[in-house]
Amino acid sequence: DQIPLAQMNTSMTINATAAWLLSLYIAVADEQGADRKALQGTTQNDVVKEYLSRGTYVFPPRPSMRLTTDIVVFTTREMPKWNPTNVCSYHLQEAGASPVQELSFALATAIALLDSIRARPEVSAEEFPELVGRISFFVNAGMRFITELCKMRAFVELWDEITLGRYG
């Protein structure tokens, strides 16, 4: 309780426990009198990855996606300097996926998340672009240099195309 959370930038590589641990973090910050809008950091908060590559999920997919979207919506509104989710495809290659499969699953996960957020009645059309901009990615860069380089270039182009074409 002596670490001034409002002056820190905290990265939490947590997924299934993201809602619970972020709540504890916020409670400590509140006890310190910190302004939630000043809190900076990231929660990985990628429960889909837990199903696809690690098997460390706690809840079934639908409730897991609900928790993820709850965190994204809450932090975007209450903690504007917080990065609420980091789609993590890194572990997919570690679990045997090819670079193409890794990229495909990362984009599919992000699309599922954004579709879930957009479907929520409390998220306005005006607020949605801010939520889109809060998603980040953690991708692998394996030993196949040229393949990985091409993957990264394709990823940027595809994500731009998806966000503009699908979400405006």
Language-model regions: role of each:
Residues D1-E148:
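Catalytic alpha/beta active-site cores
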Residues M143, I162-T163:
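Well-ordered alpha-helical scaffold segments within catalytic/enzyme domains
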Residues K151-M152:
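Composition- and surface-driven signal marking solvent-exposed, interaction-prone regions
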Residues L164-G168:
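Short, intrinsically disordered, charge-balanced linker/junction segments flanking boundaries
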